[in-house]
Amino acid sequence: MAKKVTVTLVDDFDGSGAADETVEFGLDGVTYEIDLSTKNATKLRGDLKQWVAAGRRVGGRRRGRSGSGRGRGAIDREQSAAIREWARRNGHNVSTRGRIPADVIDAYHAAT
């Protein structure tokens, strides 16, 4: 005997019937998902439209990350000190602390 299992998504907002889509949104660093009918999804987007228009976009859709995600690779204290010393001797303006600009690091690697 065969069984058929059907999963029906119900509108999370008002429970009025089947949800047509899952909407993802974020607030205060927390991402939410809500299953909504087309009508309620349109209403949510309309309600948020004025806030979205006044805000700044800080990211897009998530993508899978490859590798360690550390970019060019971390540099240790000794290497950082050597790069800063080389940069000062060669006319680059670098701070005593903090991030070393990528162009300075590239110039250091090209020269050494």
From Swiss-Prot:
<dbReference type="Pfam" id="PF11774">
    <property type="entry name" value="Lsr2"/>
</dbReference>
<keyword id="KW-0843">Virulence</keyword>
<dbReference type="GO" id="GO:0042542">
    <property type="term" value="P:response to hydrogen peroxide"/>
</dbReference>
<feature type="region of interest" description="Disordered">
    <location>
        <begin position="57"/>
        <end position="79"/>
    </location>
</feature>
<dbReference type="GO" id="GO:0071453">
    <property type="term" value="P:cellular response to oxygen levels"/>
</dbReference>
<dbReference type="InterPro" id="IPR055370">
    <property type="entry name" value="Lsr2_DNA-bd"/>
</dbReference>
<keyword id="KW-0238">DNA-binding</keyword>
<dbReference type="GO" id="GO:0016746">
    <property type="term" value="F:acyltransferase activity"/>
</dbReference>
<dbReference type="InterPro" id="IPR036625">
    <property type="entry name" value="E3-bd_dom_sf"/>
</dbReference>
<comment type="function">
    <text>DNA-bridging protein that has both architectural and regulatory roles. Influences the organization of chromatin and gene expression by binding non-specifically to DNA, with a preference for AT-rich sequences, and bridging distant DNA segments. Binds in the minor groove of AT-rich DNA. Represses expression of multiple genes involved in a broad range of cellular processes, including major virulence factors or antibiotic-induced genes, such as iniBAC or efpA, and genes important for adaptation of changing O(2) levels. May also activate expression of some gene.</text>
</comment>
<keyword id="KW-0678">Repressor</keyword>
<dbReference type="GO" id="GO:0010039">
    <property type="term" value="P:response to iron ion"/>
</dbReference>
<keyword id="KW-0805">Transcription regulation</keyword>
<dbReference type="GO" id="GO:0005829">
    <property type="term" value="C:cytosol"/>
</dbReference>
<comment type="similarity">
    <text>Belongs to the Lsr2 family.</text>
</comment>
<dbReference type="GO" id="GO:0005886">
    <property type="term" value="C:plasma membrane"/>
</dbReference>
<dbReference type="GO" id="GO:0009274">
    <property type="term" value="C:peptidoglycan-based cell wall"/>
</dbReference>
<keyword id="KW-0963">Cytoplasm</keyword>
<dbReference type="GO" id="GO:0006355">
    <property type="term" value="P:regulation of DNA-templated transcription"/>
</dbReference>
<dbReference type="GO" id="GO:0009295">
    <property type="term" value="C:nucleoid"/>
</dbReference>
<feature type="DNA-binding region">
    <location>
        <begin position="97"/>
        <end position="102"/>
    </location>
</feature>
<comment type="subunit">
    <text>Homodimer. May form higher oligomers via protease-activation.</text>
</comment>
<dbReference type="GO" id="GO:0003677">
    <property type="term" value="F:DNA binding"/>
</dbReference>
<dbReference type="InterPro" id="IPR024412">
    <property type="entry name" value="Lsr2_dim_dom"/>
</dbReference>
<protein>
    <recommendedName>
        <fullName>Nucleoid-associated protein Lsr2</fullName>
    </recommendedName>
</protein>
<keyword id="KW-0804">Transcription</keyword>
<dbReference type="InterPro" id="IPR042261">
    <property type="entry name" value="Lsr2-like_dimerization"/>
</dbReference>
<dbReference type="Pfam" id="PF23359">
    <property type="entry name" value="Lsr2_DNA-bd"/>
</dbReference>
<dbReference type="GO" id="GO:0042262">
    <property type="term" value="P:DNA protection"/>
</dbReference>
